[in-house]
């Protein structure tokens, strides 16, 4: 199974997960042209897409979904709350109602050779989820836009071979930055975003011998930067309370404006 971050950041998100027979996207929050270029970089065409799974209705996760649906008739899987939110976002354009497929929280959906589970998360959206994906041999998770993590989330994210985990902001940069007070409180709240430190603490709960690839994603342009996110998370892993601190895990930061390295698990 392959995982490719086509884009990840506060300005747009799109992640490819697939194998030889099945190709899906988690979110489509960038232009259709960028999505197609990212897919083409690994030999996949837009017409090969079997489904797009949407985490929630914020524009940085759905801005390209209308283009994809109209061009390729690709099914769109999302919770009913997310579908309602997409339907009222005028900039997305018209989407054929028949392309929408409702996925319920904690439900498993089979698409081709992949089994996808929608895991409920805490974020200021209608009915947000993150996703775990498996082909029966390998396991991956895309987990961003979480203000906090619960034991249920930890339980669902354990045992992955690859994971893209939110490391949205540095708390100090956010607090002294230019954002208005209400927005700072939103980001820092339980329905906001994971900080670098909390991403590292969550990662400590998820480490195991077979975790081959770790992406840090959804970085804020204004309140974070790649080196800081990487160093903070690595510090939490090295100094944190976990039995794997001495092991060499591959951690990389998913790029905002460029396709990241594809990983195979």
Where do the language-model regions lie?
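Short, basic/aromatic-enriched C-terminal tail that caps enzymatic domains
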Residues: 249-265
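Conserved beta-strand hairpin/beta-sheet module of binuclear metal-dependent hydrolase folds
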Residues: 1-42, 127-145, 162
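Active-site metal-binding motif and surrounding structural segment of the metallo-beta-lactamase
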Residues: 33-79
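Cap/insert and terminal regions of metallo-dependent hydrolase folds
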Residues: 151-251
